[in-house]
Amino acid sequence: MSASATRSRNKQSKLRDDERLDISKDEFNRIQEAFGQEEFRKLFFDYVEEIQDPENRKIYEEEITQLEKERGVEVRFIHPKPGFVIKTALDGELKCFINIAGSEEIERPKNEVATDPSSGNRGLSWSIPMAQTSSRDDCDAKNNHCKVFDVVFHPDALHLAKRNKQFRQCLIDTALDAVEREYKVSLDRANLKFPKLDYKGIPRPTVIRKLADNPTAEEQEPHPLAHMFPTQPPAPGKPEPRVLPLKTKPTPVPEFTVPRYSIKHSHDVDLSEYTDELDAKLHVTVPRALVVEIELPLLRSTAECQLDVTSKSVYLFSERQGAKYRLKLDLPFTVDDKAGQARFDTDLRRLSITLPVVRKSSKEQAQMHETLRHFSREDSGVELHSNSESPVEEDPDGELSDSKADISDISSPTAAPVRHSNSPFLKSSVHYQLPSKFDCNVLDNVMAFVLHVPNVQPDSIEQLREQRSLHLQFATIGSGYYPTHYAFYVELPAEHEDSAIESVEAEAWDNNVVLKLCLTSQSETPASYLAGLDATELKEYPVHGQYNVKSKEKVIARKENAPFEIKFEHNQEGQALKVSIRPGTKEEEKENQDQEPEIDQQHQQQVQNKKPGKKQRKRNKKERSLSESACADMILQEPLTKNSELQPKSTFNLPQRKQRSYSECNDSTGGSHRGILKRFSRYGPRPSMSDSCSSIDDCSSYSCSVDASGTSLFSHSFGGIPEEDRSDAGLSESCKKTVRFNDHIMKQVFRLDSSILGQRKKNQKRRDLKLRAQHRRLSEGDSVDYEESRGSALKQQENQSRNCNKPKGVSVLHDSGLDLTGAPGAHSNNNESEAKNAMMFEMDD
């Protein structure tokens, strides 16, 4: 039996002073020893016979009546006479019997003519007196525990019940209502049975007490100590009997009864649930099995009922006369209906159904584990992507594109839902916090806020935008899986009345939240702003930095687009070429263009007339014919800069990892490409010394340097050098070129137990992680300040060093055979323009 049923029976027993015997162990031992004596047993049996003797019982009642009469109380003993018995269930779990008995001490039923107020029909209104005895425990035919109640009427009422079915039903309803009202229990009215019994158990008399109408003279004498007690209120007149009103509407009797049931969650002891792992307590709230217990006190076996079990419900149905049950129960978990078990306890009349719960599949559990790991992980500043690996060594052009694609995916703005201002934005039942640290930067008409709150859920970001203010709320999940709610309200200062918010973007990162407020074009750049938890708690904060990129871009574009003046000077004795580069005016450009054709013709005639000597040929083998080809590239770049002045452009200082460098034999016309150390065509025109030194010849090729950065035109790789064939004796030795190698040796060590491709992917993954960590540390709001301060500092340092160590005119640089494009000065466009103003290549031994 369930605990609730036991508590209800105990409560009912206490109300009727029918508690179980409570004795100590010492008293129990003494009684046990006494019953072991034959003399005591004989005396005890004599006492029982004396009590059960009707004559002695009559004498006992007369003595009790006389004693109560002396106290001014009239006592009447009611001896119930058998009538008929009602069998039903008590609270849906215990069998009970109600004895409908009769006694002459009860008043006769009375009736009077009355009209039904609902229908207007005339009829008889009955008043049926009754008496109730205390409940008692008994046993049924199978020696099972049951409860017995007695309801006593006048014998005339029982006689009318036998003759009239309607009066009999009225008598039964009155008895059931009296038991439910007196003992606070629920009876099963749908399964009433009428066994062939006149009375259940042994009849026990009950007592009715009331004050005497004619007290004696002794009773009227005042008590000698009455003056010590407070004055008693005057006694009321003749007490009226308690009248229990009948129900105006009959209690609806259902066709089937819903049995009493309970659902228990069964768990097994699993030691893995007591560990500190993240997935240790995932299934703590999910039981191993469900145990459904259904109380069927009126059924003898399960053959009399039907039971259907599905994955989500249990259905019980019984049509047996006197035991009509119907139950449809929805289960809280999905169960395996084919692996369930059912057992019926005939002693307790209880049906127990055990159903194993279906756990989630391994795939769903793995997905849940990944979700929990994502919520509870600590931010390390590095984000891993399985799809970010790319073989850089094999495809150098794909590295930068892949990294840019990853960055664009990460920094995609979060689509935050926008609420209307009519509905309350912040929930009253949720406690919101203001971010402890935040800063603001202004870039033109964009205000960038950085809210330093880690692990923000992108789906939780909500915003309420107005003309001059914005309200933002979001939530985070900590290591304890408990959400923390934040709110941020920002408003433009009142000084700038024309300022208004045009659009809003909110981005959730691992360590912070970036909020962008795009102001209208008529808005002025604010120097401060108001921020707080809501509109009632605002505080003024200054803006960290203000930047105007558009004005700076115009100045930089003017400097970059300025024309350059390039001069070439040949020294035949030292075989040196002197290049001077400086900004020139438009007049100087026109003069140079007129003089260039004349100088080129004179120079070509001098070279063709003069033949090189043997020493000179040997010296030419060690020299580089680089300077004029590089200068020719610069000359070709001038018309491009002129065309770019006509078109507005916006440049951004982004770090570049690649550049295109030109070899010695670079062809500006995009002709056929020749490989390194290849002889010239036997039937084609052979280049002269002047062509190889002053122009870009046919055999041209391009090479790409991954390590170089910047856009300088002076980073070249030397390739496409022709090799003379032994059979071709007529080829001039002056066209031969040499290659110088760097002294630095690149070395790569591989482990014996790993493959080259495996280490290549590992190194590429490490480089990608460093690149992402660098981009993540510099958020969009702080990166602008960092780039501007860094660029200005580098510019000042280089100007100071250049003014102190180098002349303003021309500087001499020796070609060492090394690529200098990776130098720090090559990262800035300003440094490149100044490097062009002072440059010279000298060829010597």
UniProtKB/Swiss-Prot annotation:
**Disulphide bridges, residue numbers:** none
Q: Which GO terms describe its molecular function?
A: protein phosphatase 1 binding
Which residues are annotated as modified residue Phosphoserine in the UniProt record? 380, 779
Give the residue ranges for region: Disordered: 362-420, 575-691, 773-845
Where does it live in the cell? Cytoplasm
Task: List GO BP terms, alphabetically.
Answer: axonemal dynein complex assembly; cilium-dependent cell motility
- Acidic residues biased stretches: 391-400
Keyword Cytoplasm present in the record's keywords: the answer is yes
Determine the domain of life of the protein's source. Answer: Eukaryota
Keywords of this entry:
Cytoplasm, Phosphoprotein
Its subunit composition reads: Interacts with Pp1alpha-96A, Pp1-87B, Pp1-13C and flw.
What family does the Swiss-Prot or TrEMBL record give for this protein? Belongs to the PIH1 family. Kintoun subfamily.
**Protein name in the entry:** Protein kintoun
Organism listed in the record: Drosophila erecta (Fruit fly)
